[in-house]
UniProtKB/Swiss-Prot annotation:
GO biological-process terms attached to the record: translation
Family recorded in the similarity comment: Belongs to the universal ribosomal protein uS13 family.
Source superkingdom: Bacteria
SUPFAM superfamilies reported in the protein's UniProt record: S13-like H2TH domain (SSF46946)
Name of the protein in question: Small ribosomal subunit protein uS13
Role, per record: Located at the top of the head of the 30S subunit, it contacts several helices of the 16S rRNA. In the 70S ribosome it contacts the 23S rRNA (bridge B1a) and protein L5 of the 50S subunit (bridge B1b), connecting the 2 subunits; these bridges are implicated in subunit movement. Contacts the tRNAs in the A and P-sites.
One cellular component term from this protein's GO annotations in UniProt: cytosol
GO MF annotation: an example: rRNA binding
The keyword tRNA-binding appears for this protein: yes
Organism: Methylobacillus flagellatus (strain ATCC 51484 / DSM 6875 / VKM B-1610 / KT)
Keyword entries, A-Z: Ribonucleoprotein, Ribosomal protein, RNA-binding, rRNA-binding, tRNA-binding
Quaternary organization: Part of the 30S ribosomal subunit. Forms a loose heterodimer with protein S19. Forms two bridges to the 50S subunit in the 70S ribosome.
Region Disordered, residue ranges: 94-120
InterPro entries in the record: Rbsml_uS13_C, Ribosomal_uS13, Ribosomal_uS13-like_H2TH, Ribosomal_uS13_bac-type, Ribosomal_uS13_CS
Amino acid sequence: MARIAGVNIPNHKHTEIALTSIYGVGRTTAKQICLAAGVSATAKIKDLNDAEVEKLRDEVAKLQVEGDLRREVTMNIKRLMDLGCYRGIRHRRGLPVRGQRTKTNARTRKGPIKPIKASK
């Protein structure tokens, strides 16, 4: 099992698909990485030699992935919350940020329904 950017890459998958297991690398980026490294996107990871895996490592190292990217996203959200702007307030309250309706739906973001206790 190859290890790229601190992530174990599955051996049995095609290179393009296997690279998507790295946080911050999607299908398009994976194709670009394979093209830049000169590695076939359809070759399986187990069939690649050490030199090809090293080329992939070098290409991924040029990108902002995994911990650095997660940290940046977290800091961006924290910055919005500290500013007190509309998006920051929505993040703070745990509500949808991008204008979705909340009268109905939005249960994923709002959490389970809290029942109203009947008063006697």
